[in-house]
Regions:
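Short, cationic-aromatic polyanion-contact patches
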Residues: 7-17, 33, 66-88
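Pre-recognition alpha-helix immediately N-terminal to the DNA-recognition helix
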Residues: 18-23
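Short helix-capping/hinge SLiMs at alpha-helix to coil transitions
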Residues: 25-30
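A short acidic, leucine-rich amphipathic alpha-helix
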Residues: 36-39
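Short coil turns linking two alpha-helices in DNA-binding domains
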Residues: 44-45, 51
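Glycine-centered, phosphate/nucleic-acid-interacting loop/turn motifs that mediate DNA/RNA or nucleotide
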Residues: 59
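Short beta-strand "wing" residues that participate in macromolecule-binding interfaces
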Residues: 62-63
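Amphipathic alpha-helical dimerization/coiled-coil segments
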Residues: 80-108
Length: 108
């Protein structure tokens, strides 16, 4: 079963980093282990490890707590770059929604 791509991924492309950002921006109220991030974003753990340290070093994500040996992470909403990403994420969603509404108006 193929899952439907988000509007964000339709516009920005399906690069693994975009998939991770899309997941973290969409589900921004909770923190996740690296394994959960990889699974929910649809990327392999080894691929996530190629770039996740850059996201952490640039404060795009932040470590929120430690559960056993696992660190938990979430998107860092205090970072101005992330705030701009959130705005972009919503703008893309709004744009796609308007496109769909126009299609429905034409069909009806």
């Amino acid at each position: 079963m193929e899952t439907e791509k988000s509007s964000y991924l339709e516009v920005m492309g399906e690069h693994p980093m975009n998939k991770v950002l899309d997941f973290l921006l969409t589900f921004d109220e909770f923190d996740y282990s690296l394994t959960e991030i990889a699974q929910n974003a649809g990327v392999s753990y080894s691929t996530l490890m190629l770039f996740f340290s850059k996201l952490e070093a640039n404060s795009i994500v932040k470590c929120t707590r430690k559960v056993g040996k696992s660190k938990m992470f979430m998107i860092n909403k205090e970072n101005p770059v992330v705030q701009d990403l959130i705005k972009l994420h919503w703008q893309i969603a709004k744009q796609e929604m308007h496109k769909e509404l126009k299609k429905e108006m034409v069909v009806v």
